[in-house]
Every structure is written in structure tokens, then in C-alpha cells.
Amino acid sequence: MGISRDSRHKRSATGAKRAQFRKKRKFELGRQPANTKIGPKRIHSVRTRGGNQKFRALRVETGNFSWGSEGVSRKTRIAGVVYHPSNNELVRTNTLTKSAVVQIDATPFRQWYENHYGATLGKKKGGAHAAHAAEVADAKRSRKVERKLAARSGAAAIESAVDSQFGSGRLYAVISSRPGQSGRCDGYILEGEELAFYLRRLTAKK
């Protein structure tokens, strides 16, 4: 018995069983879920209707995530699933699907910010961070670069909820692609009201 997307096997609105008047059709087929996990990249191609292809990501460990307010995207490592709007089981098993809230490595975005604005993120108290901040501030730059950084300094401020995440080296992000269909696990960093909403959900879950 294959997975079928037809409705002929369902009972009618009054509860009566429907008579089977035809067999299952190829165009009504369904497939098993990909249940994409975090691990070394493993992608299978699936032949679909019309000779087209889908790419079934069985395991991925990186994705292309965008930082909307800064207009920048970077490829980064996915650390784990922390929240899922539809199913807690997907959080427990670290399953990557569209709309899953994940934690990603903040390093590529922190490096971009330090290069672009000449300032550090994630104010941690401690000698190592203070030394790194001083290193970034005192780095040798040409006068042209100094002028560029001075012009950008007005836009350097980011919201505190995102800044504090840089201190831990992990950022909350949402997956917006469909790993089981496209074979990619891309998304965007959570900010503003959306971040506040998911932070409330995460604290309520605990």
C-alpha cells in the first residue's frame, strides 16, 4: 500500500464509507518525509512528474542565511533546532524543515560586521573580549577606509536582543527553504518583533 493523496478513501461527511470505484493513480502518489538531519551533506535526487527532479536533503550541516536589516548573506553552520511551530518531536530529533527555528554560528556575520563597521559585537566582560575589541579598534587602516567607516558609523547600531546573541556565538534563525524539496537549508536571522515572539515561546516552553 503506497502513500496516496486522494480523498476517495475518506469517509463522507455523514460518516458513510465510500465504495472503491477505481484503483490508486500515479498522479495521486505521496512520498515519505525527508526528515532532514544535521550532518555531513547527503542529498538524493528524486525523479518526479514530467521528468523533473527534486532534491531530497537527508543530511545538511550548513546553509545560506541572510541578515535582513544589514542586507547581507553568509554561508554558516547550523548548530541545532530549538523550536518548531508544528511539532515538538521535530525539535527533539533535530529535524530541519521549513519554519523551524534553529541556532546558527554567528562567526561569519560577526567578521563581516567588524570589517564593515570597524566595531565589535556581543559585549562580553573579560580580558579576551576587551583585547579583541582593542585590536579591531586599533587596526591599521588607510585614510580612505577610515573615512568610509566614519560614514557608516551612524548605521552601526543593532538591536540589543541580536547583539547579546553575538556574545554567545549563536544566532536564532528561521529556515525559509524546503530541505526535502530543494536540497538546501537556507533562511534568515530573526530580528525585531519576530525574534521577540519566538523568545517568548522558547521561555514558555522551558
Swiss-Prot record:
Its main location: cytoplasm. CDD domains: Ribosomal_S8e_like. Residues 1-37 are annotated as: Disordered. The keyword Cell membrane does not apply. GO terms for molecular function: structural constituent of ribosome. InterPro entries: Ribosomal_eS8, Ribosomal_eS8_CS, Ribosomal_protein_eS8_euk, Ribosomal_Se8/biogenesis_NSA2. GO terms for biological process: maturation of SSU-rRNA from tricistronic rRNA transcript (SSU-rRNA, 5.8S rRNA, LSU-rRNA); translation. Keywords: Cytoplasm, Ribonucleoprotein, Ribosomal protein. PROSITE patterns: RIBOSOMAL_S8E. Pfam families: Ribosomal_S8e. GO terms for cellular component: cell surface; cytosolic small ribosomal subunit. It is found in: Cytoplasm. Component of the small ribosomal subunit. Mature ribosomes consist of a small (40S) and a large (60S) subunit. The 40S subunit contains about 32 different proteins and 1 molecule of RNA (18S). The 60S subunit contains 45 different proteins and 3 molecules of RNA (25S, 5.8S and 5S). Component of the ribosome, a large ribonucleoprotein complex responsible for the synthesis of proteins in the cell. The small ribosomal subunit (SSU) binds messenger RNAs (mRNAs) and translates the encoded message by selecting cognate aminoacyl-transfer RNA (tRNA) molecules. The large subunit (LSU) contains the ribosomal catalytic site termed the peptidyl transferase center (PTC), which catalyzes the formation of peptide bonds, thereby polymerizing the amino acids delivered by tRNAs into a polypeptide chain. Belongs to the eukaryotic ribosomal protein eS8 family. This is Small ribosomal subunit protein eS8. It comes from Candida albicans (strain SC5314 / ATCC MYA-2876).
